[in-house]
Regions:
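Iron-sulfur cluster-binding electron-transfer modules in prokaryotic oxidoreductases
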Residues: 1-254
Length: 254
């Protein structure tokens, strides 16, 4: 089995996310899954860019899919925003032929075409659906039963359900099942499925700060040892925002 990897913009470039790429590569290698990075990968033009120029944003995402199509592989990504973009472009191009034609015209200008044959998968969904929690447990090497975590799915991997075709999006459990196979206690607590406010960062920082404060308080009150994020943007929001929030609210988050 061989997959084309689309890492996105955040994972390879932000210091606090270096572990995402390293861990993903190690896990896939351990599972004997070959990967090949998409050459000269570009930004996937996530959904907020689509409000500025829909056709161009779709063409940007389709470019990476066209590269994967040339490689003859389906695509994996650890980034929820990228996953959302690739699922959306596949849906739009298959549903609206006129939009497919416009996107193809842009791709032709850089010597590419996209026939819509590439399936885009989020790495967590791939591990759960194609590999399976039981198989991962067999390959585990450490006992993590002493750890309690708060799992954050984020918004962009799950919604809208009709487009992304992931488990029922309001109360998902698939990632919980994965980590619980290693003995980890995934604590079910109020607020763990709510937005972290990451998309508001840089636009309305005060609102993003307030929402993050609420999510950190939720996790603190649940008594978890740490937070595990499915979404790289959620990771940045939680990780980089903690020190600032400790100063603003005069509170130490565990």
């Amino acid at each position: 089995m061989k997959k084309a990897m689309a890492w996105g913009c955040l994972v390879p470039t932000r210091r606090s996310l270096i572990g995402y790429e390293a861990a993903t590569r190690k896990v896939l290698e351990h599972l004997n899954i070959e990967t090949a990075d998409i050459p000269n990968e570009t930004c996937c033009a996530p959904f907020w860019m689509q409000s500025l120029d829909l056709t161009t944003s779709l063409a940007m995402a389709a470019r990476n899919l066209a590269k994967a199509e040339e490689m003859g592989m389906d695509l994996l990504t650890p980034c929820s925003g990228c996953f959302h973009s690739y699922k959306r472009v596949n849906h739009v191009l298959k549903t609206y032929p006129d939009m497919h034609e416009k996107v193809d015209d842009i791709l032709k200008s850089v010597g590419l075409r996209y026939d819509g044959t590439v399936e885009a998968r989020h790495i967590v969904d791939f591990l759960y659906t194609d590999i399976g929690a039981a198989e991962l447990q067999k390959r585990s090497t450490r006992d993590l039963s002493s750890i309690s975590i708060g799992l954050r799915y984020g918004c962009h991997m799950l919604k809208p359900h009709e487009l992304l075709n992931i488990e029922y999006s309001e109360r998902p459990t698939f990632a919980d099942e994965l980590i619980e196979q290693f003995g980890v206690n995934s604590v079910q607590y109020p607020g763990r499925h709510r937005c972290c406010g990451g998309l508001l960062r840089g636009v309305q920082d005060d609102v993003a700060d307030r929402i993050l404060h609420e999510r950190l308080v939720d996790a603190n009150e649940a008594g978890v040892d740490g937070i595990v994020t499915v979404c790289s943007l959620c990771h940045l929001q939680h990780d980089m925002g903690q020190r600032r929030k400790s100063q603003c609210y005069n509170r130490c988050y565990r």
